[in-house]
Swiss-Prot record:
This is Acetyl-coenzyme A carboxylase carboxyl transferase subunit beta. The gene is accD. It is found in: Cytoplasm. Residues 30-299 form the CoA carboxyltransferase N-terminal domain. HAMAP family: AcetylCoA_CT_beta.
Length: 319
């Protein structure tokens, strides 16, 4: 027997021995490998922990509907503007027609676009909620995303509801050109009208939150929350380094870096997010049951409360 025949025979024996193992039925996706620490986790346990690795705390991405299930009390979610769907006004084509790309993502995600909006209860407290989905064209903000968020904010303003937006986006959608960019000002205007009614707005920045979303409604909150180690910024890291010709810090454009420099108010792990949001919304209620001492006495006029602040701009303050 030649050396070649010997190797061929042994290869056939090896394949025969491995065949029963290959035929063994193993549930697809039974285990999940952490992208950060490489730990293997039973997928069911990972989902029960809201897709957060128990070994290192790495936050895996979650879809918009899963995020709603994590935050909203069961049976209280009412989706709004679900029938608003994108079109292709510019007849845009890159490697594929924009209209075809939209159909592919709609079939893949079972979403009409990169955000879902609605109302519900969070620990019994009503709110208006928008959740962006990075799985739909990178969570890019097109005209429909802008319209749905704008409608949600306007609904919250009319109904006196706090608004929470969970951001996950690569920025404005290039396939819609200026129609995409104008959503930045459109949503910002709606949020300003919401603010004048003294209503609460909280954006939650997840990985990633970049581009035009960061440059508009993601940074306009009364309180700005972020998930741990989320990438948050406007331009990409390499673009900034090449423009400035400087090496950026390793933690640049992370939620921890932004917290250190005052751009976000708190970093909240996903497993604590629902409780934290409920506490913030509860404390903002005009009549909070556990803080009666903070309510104004009946004889105190609300306008009088601000007089000492106004007086600081007069010369009498310095006499």
């Amino acid at each position: 027997m030649s050396l070649f025949d010997w190797f061929a025979a042994n290869r056939q024996n090896s394949e025969t021995q491995l065949q029963p193992q290959q035929e063994r039925e193993i549930a697809d996706g039974l285990w999940t490998k952490c992208k950060s620490c490489d730990a293997l986790t039973y997928t069911k346990d990972l989902r029960n922990n809201q897709m957060v690795c128990k070994e290192c705390g790495f936050h895996n991405r979650v879809g918009s509907r899963e995020r709603v299930r994590q935050l909203i009390d069961e049976g209280t979610w009412t989706e709004i503007s679900q029938n608003v769907a994108p079109t292709d006004p510019l007849k845009f084509r890159d490697k594929k027609a924009y209209s075809d790309r939209l159909k592919d993502y709609q079939e893949k995600t079972n979403l009409t676009d990169a955000v879902i909006t609605g109302t519900g209860l969070i620990d019994g407290l009503p709110l208006a909620l928008a959740v962006m989905d990075f799985g739909f064209m990178g969570g890019s903000m097109g005209s429909v995303v802008g319209e749905k968020i704008c409608r949600l904010v306007e609904h919250g303003t009319a109904e006196g509801l706090p608004v929470v937006v969970v951001c996950a986006s690569g920025g404005a959608r290039m396939q819609e050109g200026m129609l995409s960019l104008m959503q930045m000002a459109k949503i910002s205007g709606a949020l300003e009208r919401h603010r004048t009614k003294k209503l609460l707005y909280i954006p939650v920045l997840t990985n990633p939150t970049t581009g035009g979303v960061t440059a508009s409604f993601a940074m306009l909150g009364d309180l700005i929350l972020a998930e741990p180690k989320a990438t948050i910024g406007f331009a990409g890291r390499r673009v900034i380094e090449q423009t400035l010709r400087e090496k950026l810090p390793d933690d640049f454009q992370t939620s921890e870096y932004l917290l250190q420099h005052g751009f976000v108010d708190a970093i909240v792990p996903r497993t604590e997010l629902k409780k934290t949001l409920a506490q913030m919304i509860s404390l903002h209620q005009p009549f909070h049951p556990i803080l009666p001492e903070l309510q104004l006495a009946p004889h105190v006029e609300k306008e009088k409360v601000y007089e000492p602040i106004a007086s600081t701009s007069t010369n009498d303050f310095y006499k």
